[in-house]
Amino acid sequence: MNMIMVISVNIILSSTLILVAFWLPQLNIYTEKANPYECGFDPMSSARLPFSMKFFLVAITFLLFDLEIALLLPIPWAIQMPDMKTMMLTAFILVSILALGLAYEWTQKGLEWTE
């Protein structure tokens, strides 16, 4: 009974927050909110310039591999655990998945700037 109450309160609160987040910004839309802000000055050119999609993909790839390093950093401390086999298997699976992703990215020429 207690668990059902906690789950229902969480669902009600999260639904309320989502509805308010979608409903509130639509109340007062005017042009000043839509303009880009640059230190109080009018922008000299368009602030909404497109950027290279290749740069975006390389940046996302960098973030993924940076996350891999962050996930593998606790391994020296985990070596002290009594069940080292599970820890090493998990680390091997993580590195294998990311290596396969890098190989796929490389074969699809996602890491090259020129097309």
Swiss-Prot record:
Pfam family, one: Oxidored_q4
Keywords: Electron transport, Membrane, Mitochondrion, Mitochondrion inner membrane, NAD, Respiratory chain, Translocase, Transmembrane, Transmembrane helix, Transport, Ubiquinone
GO molecular function: NADH dehydrogenase (ubiquinone) activity
Parts of the chain that traverse the membrane: 4-24, 55-75, 86-106
Catalytic activity, reaction form: a ubiquinone + NADH + 5 H(+)(in) = a ubiquinol + NAD(+) + 4 H(+)(out)
EC numbers for this chain: 7.1.1.2
Subunit relationships: Core subunit of respiratory chain NADH dehydrogenase (Complex I) which is composed of 45 different subunits. Interacts with TMEM186. Interacts with TMEM242.
Protein name (database record): NADH-ubiquinone oxidoreductase chain 3
The species this protein was found in: Baiomys taylori
Taxonomic classification: Eukaryota, Metazoa, Chordata, Craniata, Vertebrata
